[in-house]
Amino acid sequence: MLTQTLADRSAEMAPHFQPAFLQRQQASFQFLFDSGEPFHLEVEGTSFEFSPGEARQPTITLYIKDHATCWNLLDGSMDGMNAFMDGSYRADGNIVLSQLILYLFRRAEPAFSYEIQD
């Protein structure tokens, strides 16, 4: 079941993937949950893959309340600072990556353009 969920989420998130936010070619993100099976994200260049289980050598380990919180953080519908402050999100490892991952799959905000006329 987790394997299918990860495949479905990958397909949903692929159009929004922005690897330039990481400022590195490779990263391994381990997601551990208070409730729910662990999984990890491997980023290699311009590709990514979510896999069930634990990574061999994660670049960073993210401790998250549950799967729903994780997906909400990744798609930008939940603020990372709020999740951190309420104890739903913390990290061990390369802490800079704990912030950059929050923008890795974020959907672009609509842009507004204004024209000023005299």
Please identify what each model-predicted range represents:
Residues 1-118:
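Feature captures hydrophobic
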